[in-house]
Amino acid sequence: MAMPLTTAIDAWDKRWATVEGRADWLDPAPDVIALLPELKARGARTALDLGCGVGRHALFLAEHGLIVEAIDGSAAGLKFARETAQARGVSLGLQQATADALPFDEGSFDFVLSWNVIHHGSLGDVGRRLAEIWRVMKPGALYQGTMLPTRNINYGRGRTIAPDTFVVDGSERGHPHFYCDAATLVALFAGFELLSLTQQLHRKPGSWHWHIIAERRPL
């Protein structure tokens, strides 16, 4: 059974509702910017930003000519993304939804982005979300995303609620976080061809993340 994301969505709602909470989440990640030429070279037209937050990546992709759908569980994040898109004259398809049941047809997208999203849950949750992502991608489409390695400084902190899955109660990490080694990640991406797999630091010391680029394999 999938772990509920209620606590995570509540936390993001509170964060996205304030100027201070949004401040670090307004600019697209450098890796996403860097992938744009490859998307253009492949003729990508349709994109899904899965867990779009306040819309930083969805807006970037749309402003560079892609037809973008974006989902998030946070109403506050979607509200800010919608208002920003209107202010910039950018067209975005925005829906309140989660990665557990994507509201799109099979083979809808040339590109799916999932930045700091799918690891909120257990190993089984991540596997089900990747199956949903695979379903809505066209054969040969690109996936870009992040996950958490066991090298991350927060691995093992808090309550263990499933293998390699932890919750730190009373903190911003008060919802499940799943961590994995390279072998587990490769197994999770069995339906994809991994094109790039690196570990990179994010904002804080020890905040290692997997950075993934993969191509959807055909049936």
Segments predicted by a language model, with ranges:
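A short acidic, Gly/Pro-enriched loop at the edge of an enzyme's catalytic core
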Residues: 100-112
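A short beta-strand submotif of the Rossmann-like class I SAM-dependent methyltransferase core
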Residues: 114-117
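Class I (Rossmann-like) S-adenosyl-L-methionine-dependent methyltransferase catalytic domain
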Residues: 2-44, 54-101, 125, 142-219
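A short glycine-rich, Lys/Arg-flanked "PGG" loop and its adjoining helix->strand segment in the class I
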Residues: 127-139
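A short His-aromatic
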Residues: 119-121
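Conserved beta-strand/loop positions that form the S-adenosyl-L-methionine
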Residues: 50
